[in-house]
Amino acid sequence: MNHFKIIVPLYNVQDWVKKCVKSIQLQTYSNYECYLVDDISTDSSREIIKSLIQDDERFVLIENTEKKFALRNIYEAIEHSGDNPEDVIVTLDGDDWFATKKALEILNEVYLENRCFMTYGSYIEFPSMKRGPFCKQIPHDVVKGSTYRQSKWFSSHLRTFKRHLWERIEVSDLKNGDEFFRMTWDMAFMFPMLEMSGPLAIHIDKMLYSYNRQNPLNDDKVNHRLQLLTERHIREKNKYEQDFVIADILGPSGNLSGIGNQLFCVATALGYAYEHSATPIFPQIRTDRFINMFKDTFYKNLNVGREGDFSTAFHQEPFFEFQKIKHTRGALKIRGYFQSYKYFENHRNKILDSLNIHELKNGIKEKYGDYSDFVSIHVRRGDYLHLSQYHYNLQMDYYNNAIEHFGKDSKFLIFSNDIDWCKQEFNSLKNVQFSENKDDWEDIILMSTCRDNVIANSSFSWWGAWLNTNNSKTVIAPSRWFGPAYSNKSIKDLIPEDWITNV
């Protein structure tokens, strides 16, 4: 659920402000606050507003004592509204109104689905009731080249953005000298935010906004020449440079559907992003069914953004060998297996936060109990039995040696895609349990809550061990990972140095 902060600058709007306020109060989505900023109106705007919001705690009326104009009013209202970086700011002029009572509901769905930074959209003009001329999606080549300031103006009402994006704008870029721009305020903050958002700026085609053409105080009517001069000045401001890394989670073959393989690519993109202050984007979370199934668990906190290839550079990883990814300005697309902790180990805590691990662990413990004194054992059979040319089938000697390492009286929790076979092979253990009938993400997280881990030659249990945050954990991993077809592949970059491979 998103929390919206609706900012409404207004001046002498007595003929329309009731329609504006009512359109907010009638929203079907109620998780919002509204800040109305009256810029010393000389008509009855304030009195009308006070009568409408007197019993509604979600509304705040800010009454200026000096003339500040719209952009400064928006800036100060946002500063006044709190400091949660995930709040969604919505700008609505006091002489305009929401075109539908489901506007916030639709916005909430868009932000949840796309994990975007900002939205722009479509509006209907009043009183003609015609679609506005700027209701268009920004062209792909403009987004890719970040040439917003050199292009036609597209990003129109309804404009919304995450607060963390707003906080990255330099105040000087909202000003002409010492004063905030008095006109064309939308361009002043939209250009920087579009440049910083790239594919994370989403166009909404549905009509959410009613733009009032009747107001004689509209900028283009009051001083069209000053409006054009201000627009030129804003376009000449310095461009905001932002790097992006776009992950092709499905890998070189296009079928890395397993969660273990996915996580290597995701973590690598996150590691690159943290290393170079880039913005990571994962559009396949929305479009691919094998990735989408984890959108509410591991990928809950990740950016999705627009579809399409917006990359200006491409990095293809060599199979199973660590190769540092060169920093690239602009948008970099990465594709590969990336099966090495070296891509992201330096940012471990941030990776854990990004993958929602702490919340997931708490949920698993609450659902299945506390296994913090157990040793997890993962046995990979199933598909490996038919692909032994590529994947080595671990023998029971490996598991017996691992059990001896911990002692047979230890508590063991066994995970496998062939539990029936495991129940026969491990039936001599005194304290053993088997994980059954769980989702893949649940098994990985449950492994990570165990005290120690015995993994298979599988990215699935590799992640169960890596996500284990027990500082004194022991992880036992096989020294042989591949079958004869891949005998030339090394795992030197795959297994962390403190894991044991010689049992």
Regions found by a protein language model. Name each.
Residues 67, 95-97, 124-126, 166, ...:
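Short, solvent-exposed loop/turn segments at secondary-structure junctions
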Residues 285-408:
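Secretory-pathway luminal glycosyltransferase catalytic domains
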Residues 483-503:
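Leloir-type glycosyltransferase catalytic cores
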Residues 1-242:
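Nucleotide-sugar donor-binding/catalytic module of glycosyltransferases
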Residues 264-273:
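Histidine-anchored nucleotide/phosphate-binding helix
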Residues 49-52, 290-301, 422-429, 487-492:
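Short, aromatic/basic amphipathic alpha-helical patches
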Residues 253-264:
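A short, glycine/small-residue-rich beta-strand->loop->alpha-helix junction that serves as a flexible
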Residues 259, 406-490:
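Donor-binding and catalytic core of enzymes assembling or modifying cell-surface/extracellular glycoconjugates
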